[in-house]
Amino acid sequence: MGSLSGLRLAAGSCFRLCERDVFSSLRLTRSSDLKRINGFCTKPQESPRAPSRTYNRVPLHKPTEWQKKILVWSGRFKKEDEIPETVSLEMLDTAKNKMRVKISYLMIALTVVGCICMVIEGKKAAQRHESLTSLNLEKKARLREEAAMKAKTE
């Protein structure tokens, strides 16, 4: 009984070694054919095909009026008349990105100007002794007076 289990273990380890060697020598190629590395199994010979189309050119795009304005505003061209009939998509993307950056700089500048204006207005209000606390107290006093007047008339 003991020799049978030993034989089974030896056979299993031998099988695993062979399996590992077989699968390590096989690999998957692009056309999903199995190919043996050491050359015993080879891929079927295929006749070389001439490429049907070559894509050496950059795809061109006819810009719309809005895209032409973006190209001019981004500084790529001086006038709309200078823009060719077709431009590359990469050129349009670059112009759009430049415009995004310019617009974000403008928004940053407007935010800073707005903050400065609010600080100046706040200082002027402080000189007039206007604060949220004083305004709320005045409003509550006025509402109490109106409520008292309303209670007297009823």
Curated annotation (Swiss-Prot):
It comes from the Eukaryota. Pfam families: DUF1075. The keyword Glycoprotein does not apply. Its main location: mitochondrion. GO terms for biological process: cellular response to hypoxia; neuron apoptotic process; positive regulation of apoptotic process; positive regulation of release of cytochrome c from mitochondria. Keywords: Apoptosis, Membrane, Mitochondrion, Transmembrane, Transmembrane helix. The keyword Electron transport does not apply. It is found in: Mitochondrion membrane. The chain crosses the membrane at residues 103-120. Residues 76-102 are annotated as: Required for proapoptotic activity. GO terms for cellular component: cytosol; mitochondrial membrane. It is a single-pass membrane protein. InterPro entries: DUF1075 (IPR009432). Proposed to be involved in regulation of apoptosis; the exact mechanism may differ between cell types/tissues. May be involved in hypoxia-induced cell death of transformed cells implicating cytochrome C release and caspase activation (such as CASP9) and inducing mitochondrial permeability transition. May be involved in hypoxia-induced cell death of neuronal cells probably by promoting release of AIFM1 from mitochondria to cytoplasm and its translocation to the nucleus; however, the involvement of caspases has been reported conflictingly. Belongs to the UPF0389 family. Interacts with HSP90AB1; HSP90AB1 is essential for FAM162A mitochondrial localization and pro-apoptotic activity. Interacts with VDAC2; the interaction is probably involved in inducing mitochondrial permeability transition. This is Protein FAM162A.
